[in-house]
UniProtKB/Swiss-Prot annotation:
One of its GO terms (biological process) is DNA repair. GO terms for cellular component: cytoplasm. Pfam families: HSM3_C, HSM3_N. This is DNA mismatch repair protein HSM3. Belongs to the proteasome subunit S5B/HSM3 family.
Length: 497
């Protein structure tokens, strides 16, 4: 290979690196990783302008060589090249890499490092008008999305970079390119072809792509049929449980965007899937996340729909919760995570019919159900009567503080806690009497105190009375005694769940 035609204005360290790379390329020998890594570290302070004509070509030669992985096993040259081009304008870059080279490299993934480099250039320089014009003139968005949505074997790194490209269009507010992606006929035809595909890898990418676009515009001008699925289709996907889980997770995220009108029938189909005894438990567990999102939604329409769904499906009726007595994971998760107010509103005898028959306090698997229903003003009096009035003081410290943490989150349970002087004094105010055996327990107590001192229950004389003392205890834990200052001891009251 000819010697580099560098000028005298190039610093010695840069000349040394170029010379080393040239010899490594000629001899097909591994580059000195330490030399390159050290150079990358100081690159920001070096004037590269005089070396660009030599630097980039030799790196390109190595990257496109059949023995690239042998010459650069640690992929440092990709990092080096990205650092170099990041310091150039897009106009300077196209003087080194021809527009035709960039377009052809983006269209083909035969040389993954080069494709990634060109994608990186486009993304990094997206804020420059010249880059946006280049993308529009050369249909770059369509080239990238066609590969993304058509090639199931596309390198995962390239997949991630294309998603980053679309995200970058949104972050840089490149409206003309985004609107083209949403409305141009060739894009719409591409989306429809993938929606009708049986390839679940490509379908999953289409759904990921739609989620990205929703961060740009919630009322997407896309056909809702692109992301709605019939009951027949969902049943068909049972043969591919991994995709089915991805589909459910898509709808969990979709609920966050309050896209209800088009997708509510699909969510209903998922509830039917949940009730189907032949559905795998790990799929059911994912479906529950949709119900959880609906039950805690701030949008009134979503809340109403969630309640309607619970009522019509009878999910919380005792005949649909039979397996909870067999420690069925989906049923336990359902009762432990869905908003307890929604559960009670859809089945006002849930305590009598189901919860009262479970050992909520002493059984580790049912304990999360107890914690969840502390938040229900309807169920809490029953829990108070059956468990909290007499049994709390007999609990191991770790379990007790988890319960106290839940108490601290709601006004009705705070009232109960602060009405109990023994609990408040012994477990919240006395920092010496109780032994803390682990960091987690210490921080749980700190969180309880923080919740209480930040509470604003205007109609609670109990809170008004205890707040100064709670504040002192909180300050002592936060700014005074640390867990490392506590002498470890052994207590029979301290057990793990």
């Amino acid at each position: 290979m000819p010697a580099p035609a560098t000028t005298t204005s190039v610093d010695e360290q840069t000349l040394s690196v170029i010379d080393h790379l040239t010899k490594s390329y000629d001899n097909k020998s591994e580059i000195d990783s330490t030399l390159i890594d050290d150079y990358i570290t100081v690159l920001g302070s070096i004037d590269l302008l005089g070396a660009i004509a030599d630097f980039i070509p030799i790196i390109n030669h190595i990257l496109t060589d059949n023995l690239y992985h042998q010459i650069d096993p640690n992929r440092l040259l990709i990092e080096l090249l990205q650092k170099i081009v990041s310091r150039l304008s897009f106009g300077q870059i196209v003087s080194v890499y021809s527009p035709e080279f960039i377009v052809s490299s983006l269209a083909s993934s035969d040389n993954v490092p080069i494709t990634k480099l060109c994608l990186s250039i486009i993304i990094q320089k997206l804020h420059e008008p010249e880059t946006v014009s280049f993308i529009a003139e050369n249909c770059i968005s369509f080239i990238l999305l066609k590969n993304y949505l058509s090639d199931a074997k596309l390198d995962l790194g390239i997949v991630n970079q294309i998603e980053l490209y679309v995200n970058s269009l949104i972050l840089n507010d490149v409206t003309n390119l985004l609107e083209e992606i949403l409305t141009d006929t060739k894009f719409v035809i591409l989306y429809n072809s993938i929606r009708n595909s049986e390839n679940t890898i490509l379908l999953a990418r289409l759904l990921d792509f739609i989620l990205i676009l929703l961060t740009y515009k919630v009322d997407l001008p896309l056909d809702p049929r692109l992301y709605t699925f019939s009951n027949v289709e969902i049943v068909t996907f049972k043969d591919d449980p991994l995709f089915l889980i991805l589909l459910v997770q898509f709808y969990v995220k979709l609920v966050q965007f309050s896209v209800l009108e088009e997708v509510s029938p699909v969510i209903g189909n998922f509830v039917n899937l949940y009730k189907d005894p032949t559905t795998d438990d790990f799929v059911k567990v994912e479906v529950i996340d949709i119900l959880v999102k609906l039950s805690y939604a701030t949008n009134s329409l979503l809340i109403e729909y969630g309640l309607e769904l619970a009522l019509n499906s009878e999910l919380f009726k005792s005949h649909n919760l039979i397996k909870v007595y067999e420690y069925n994971e989906p049923d336990i998760k359902l009762l432990s995570n869905v908003n307890p107010d929604l559960i009670v509103h859809s089945s006002n005898v849930i305590y009598e019919d189901v919860l009262s028959n479970l050992s909520l306090l002493n059984n580790k698997q049912y304990f999360p159900i107890l914690l969840n229903f502390i938040g229900s003003t309807d169920v809490f009096p029953r829990l108070e009567q059956d468990y909290f009035t007499t049994k709390l003081k007999h609990l191991p410290a770790d379990k007790l503080y988890v319960i106290l943490l839940e108490f601290s989150k709601f006004s009705h349970s705070r009232k109960f806690l602060l009405s109990n002087a023994t609990l408040t004094n012994d477990y919240l105010l006395d920092n010496d009497n109780l032994t803390f055996v682990n960091n987690e327990l210490w921080h749980t107590k700190l969180q309880v105190l923080e919740n209480l001192v930040n509470a604003t229950d205007s109609d609670s004389p109990e809170l008004a009375h205890w707040k100064p003392y709670l504040q002192d205890s909180f300050n002592l834990m936060r700014h005074g005694k640390k867990i490392r200052d506590v002498v470890p001891q052994v207590s029979i009251l301290d057990e793990t769940l």
